[in-house]
A protein has these predicted regions:
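Short beta-strand scaffold segments in enzyme catalytic cores
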Residues: 26-40, 132
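Zn2+-dependent cytidine deaminase-like catalytic core
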Residues: 3-7, 39-161
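Short, basic/aromatic recognition patches
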Residues: 1-26
């Protein structure tokens, strides 16, 4: 049976996450416009810096920082940010971002995840219209970026992944 295009792109994002270097959670993101992949991104340290998988430890884990908090202490650039950095804004206007995350300890997909507050801001400013997030092999959610604009969670202190 032929895979629908949403799962096709989510499958590609899931493959992209395999390049990730985080010891806690790896994410893969792809940006698609007019059924063409504009760019890809995965979780990893900035170019030229050591990755956590090379160092053998995660600073946030050592400090027992819970998921969704204190990202300024993380070595990695998030998958969404890396995908956005790699694409010109003119090609992202009206595009769709596909996002998949995997917990590196369990090997399971990260259910009910969402982009962190900083990545949401980048997605908004990039001009991306929709975000598809895979929850498990059979289910995904579609988020209208306009919802993130209208419901400014930075006013409510709600966290992302």
């Amino acid at each position: 049976m032929r895979t629908d295009k949403f799962n096709y792109y989510l499958d590609i994002a899931e493959t992209v996450l395999e390049r990730g270097t985080c010891l806690r959670r790896n994410f893969g993101a792809i940006i698609v416009r007019h059924d063409s992949i504009i760019s890809t991104g995965y979780t990893g340290a900035p170019r030229g810096r050591c990755n956590c998988c090379d160092l053998g430890y995660c600073r946030r884990e050592q400090l027992q920082i819970p998921r969704g908090e204190r990202y300024e202490l993380c070595r990695s650039v998030h998958a969404e940010a890396n995908a956005i950095i790699a694409a010109p804004r003119s090609e992202m206007l009206g595009s769709t971002l596909y996002l998949v995350g995997r917990d590196m300890k369990t090997g399971e997909l990260v259910p009910n995840t969402s982009s962190c507050a900083m990545c949401k801001r980048m997605i908004i400013n990039a001009g991306i219209d929709k975000v598809y997030i895979r929850d498990d092999e059979a289910n995904y959610r579609v988020i209208s970026v306009q919802e993130w604009i209208d419901n400014d969670e930075s006013l409510d202190m709600i966290e992302g992944y």
